[in-house]
């Protein structure tokens, strides 16, 4: 049974501007695992695209959950990783989480579908 669907779209330039002013933005948005992946990218633009994609994913996840970001769930509570095929995944107790992330030159977007787990 579907619990919720969330979608988020972010301008990559907006994330670039925030990152330029606040380098600690990475620590605020990304988990330790995500930070490790971020730091392994050699091209600065790819880092920003990754950061924007994860930002959009976490926003979309919180919308699907129905809480938004803040009191009930924070950026660092949501760890988005890639499986062996490269598919983005989020583990969250009680739910099966379906994630899609996409980028263009100017935008990053993510859609998250939360399905109640039968177990």
UniProtKB/Swiss-Prot annotation:
Its EC number is 2.7.8.7. Gene3D superfamilies: 4'-phosphopantetheinyl transferase domain. It is an enzyme of class 2 (transferase). InterPro entries: 4-PPantetheinyl_Trfase_dom, 4-PPantetheinyl_Trfase_dom_sf, ACPS, Ppantetheine-prot_Trfase_dom. One of its GO terms (molecular function) is holo-[acyl-carrier-protein] synthase activity. It is found in: Cytoplasm. Keywords: Cytoplasm, Fatty acid biosynthesis, Fatty acid metabolism, Lipid biosynthesis, Lipid metabolism, Magnesium, Metal-binding, Transferase. The keyword NADP does not apply. One of its GO terms (cellular component) is cytoplasm. One of its GO terms (biological process) is fatty acid biosynthetic process. It catalyses: apo-[ACP] + CoA = holo-[ACP] + adenosine 3',5'-bisphosphate + H(+). Its cofactor is Mg(2+). It comes from the Bacteria. Mg(2+) binds at residues 8, 59. Disulfide bonds: none annotated. Transfers the 4'-phosphopantetheine moiety from coenzyme A to a Ser of acyl-carrier-protein. Belongs to the P-Pant transferase superfamily. AcpS family. NCBIfam families: acpS, pantethn_trn. This is Holo-[acyl-carrier-protein] synthase. It comes from Staphylococcus aureus (strain COL).
